[in-house]
Amino acid sequence: MTNTENYFKVGTIVNTHGIRGEVKIMAITDFAQDRFKKGADLFIDTKQGRIPVKVQSSRLHKNMWLVLFVGVTNINEIEKYKGDDVYIEGTARPELEDDQYYYDEIIDSTVVDLDGNKIGVVKEIMETGANDVWIVQRDGQSDALIPMIDDVVKSVDVDAKLITIDALEGLLD
């Protein structure tokens, strides 16, 4: 996709599922149940350009979304999209509360401690029952798991992609 400015990646088609045209999508989005719900408008980013599709049905299966698009009836119609990314239009994103963020606003953000020392870069977000956990890649060390709670996360500057945390004792061990 040449211009992704008004589009947001929500997943990647990793494989087909069965012979009736379903695809397995590895979601990299918050609100996945809304992104892939029946009637949702998505765009497949192909080498030939962006192709609009509409979700006919979807379900979660083994941490992947199995999605069938309207008009697709067999594997031959969809197999060519294996490996392609799936996007939503930017206008499809609702406003969030002040202390809530979209994944793409957090991923690749630099994490620093209260003194401004770099800890690492957020590479992934893990959803847990209580709160999200940011997986921070550190240079020459194992990844740090940063819980998205008020006691730890002190500020998030989405525009600067900078997150300041209070590295509580034992958090970075």
From Swiss-Prot:
GO cellular component: cytoplasm; ribosome
Boundaries of every PRC barrel domain copy: 98-171
GO biological process, alphabetically ordered: ribosomal small subunit biogenesis; rRNA processing
Keywords: Chaperone, Cytoplasm, Ribosome biogenesis, rRNA processing
Any Pfam family hit: PRC
Protein purpose: An accessory protein needed during the final step in the assembly of 30S ribosomal subunit, possibly for assembly of the head region. Essential for efficient processing of 16S rRNA. May be needed both before and after RbfA during the maturation of 16S rRNA. It has affinity for free ribosomal 30S subunits but not for 70S ribosomes.
Name the record gives this protein: Ribosome maturation factor RimM
Organism: Leuconostoc mesenteroides subsp. mesenteroides (strain ATCC 8293 / DSM 20343 / BCRC 11652 / CCM 1803 / JCM 6124 / NCDO 523 / NBRC 100496 / NCIMB 8023 / NCTC 12954 / NRRL B-1118 / 37Y)
Upper classification of the organism: Bacteria, Bacillati, Bacillota, Bacilli, Lactobacillales
